[in-house]
Amino acid sequence: MNQPSLDELLEKVDSRYTLVVVAAKRARELTERGKTKADGAAVMKPVTAALMEIAQNKVGYKRTRSGIK
């Protein structure tokens, strides 16, 4: 799968701002854990890996009063 399109990603979240926050938080998690492979693929940048996971419904989010979890 190539990089997911913005339209495809926006179907998974409620707004583009949510998409940015969720992708950034997941990319930070991947960086801290040193995991930037998606399904055994070659090493990729953390943000790209995060966006791929969002497109594949592997990452979810929960909106709270204090932000997005």
UniProtKB/Swiss-Prot annotation:
Q: Which domain of life is it from?
A: Bacteria
- Key word Magnesium present in the record? no
Reaction equations catalysed: RNA(n) + a ribonucleoside 5'-triphosphate = RNA(n+1) + diphosphate
Q: Which SUPFAM superfamilies match?
A: RPB6/omega subunit-like
List the Gene Ontology MF annotations in alphabetical order: DNA binding; DNA-directed RNA polymerase activity
| Alphabetical list of InterPro entries matching this protein | DNA-dir_RNA_pol_omega (IPR003716), Pol_omega/Rpo6/RPB6 (IPR006110), RPB6/omega-like_sf (IPR036161)
Please give the SMART domains that the UniProt record associates with this protein: RNA_pol_Rpb6 (SM01409)
> What keywords were assigned to this record?
DNA-directed RNA polymerase, Nucleotidyltransferase, Transcription, Transferase
What functional role does this protein have? Promotes RNA polymerase assembly. Latches the N- and C-terminal regions of the beta' subunit thereby facilitating its interaction with the beta and alpha subunits.
| Family, similarity comment | Belongs to the RNA polymerase subunit omega family.
Task: Tell me the protein's name.
Answer: DNA-directed RNA polymerase subunit omega
Q: Which organism is it from?
A: Pelotomaculum thermopropionicum (strain DSM 13744 / JCM 10971 / SI)
Record gene name: rpoZ
